Structures are given as C-alpha cells and as structure tokens.
Amino acid sequence: AEITGLPSLGDDSGLEVESLDGAPGIFSARYAGKKGNDSLNNQKLLKEISLKKNRSAKFVSILSFLDPELKNPFFSYGELFGKIIDSPKGKGGFGYDPIFQVKNSNLTLAEISKTERMRISHRTMSTLKMITLLKESKIY
C-alpha cells in the first residue's frame, strides 16, 4: 500500500502443531528447508511428531488489509482444527492436506472434495471475516 498507493491485502497462513509448540507455523512452506517441497515437508513433520501423543493441529490464516488513505489496517483470522495422522491419505489438495485429518471427520483434507475443502478452509474463514469487516466499516 505504501509503495503503490493502492489498497493492499496480505495473507500469512500456516500449519501449527500443538506438540511442536506451533511449528511449522510461518515456516510451513519451507519447513524442510529452502529446497523442500510438499513431500519433504510432510516427511519432516511426520518424523518430528512420530513419538508425540498429542497430534492436535490447526491451519491458521491471518489477513491484513490496508488502504493508504486510512489510518488503521483491518485484520481477520481463520482456523481449521484437526490432527496429524501417521501417513499420507488422499490425492487432492496440496501441502499438508494428505496428513491433516479434519476435526470430527475420518478424512484428511486430501480426501475431501475441492468444494468441501474451500467451504471449511481457514483462508475462507479469514476472507469471509474480512469481507464482513470491510462492509461493516461502511468504507467499502
């Protein structure tokens, strides 16, 4: 916003595993290193959590919106709760989806439909909250 002079929207999302003190967190995409990929990230996470009893995890998305003509930014937050399973299941999605089992479900994100993934997504939640904030502000 400062550089372009235009309103800007930013997203920071990641996976937080309770027994790993919130890791991988903001490093989710680079968890296995700079040359890592989804498969290597999943392998590293599964290795680190292998001896842990608590496998609770959540996907988190935080959006920030700033209009350079306004003084205060808007922030919204979305979460999707679940747990990390022992091995990958499913072919859909990306990232940690094959090892993330959605709370109150027997399915991983990689096993559910794209439509359902989008409906329950942490990013969808934070986006809907942002839309509400902007509408309620009566600025947009």
Predicted feature residues:
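Anionic-ligand binding patches
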Residues: 1-140
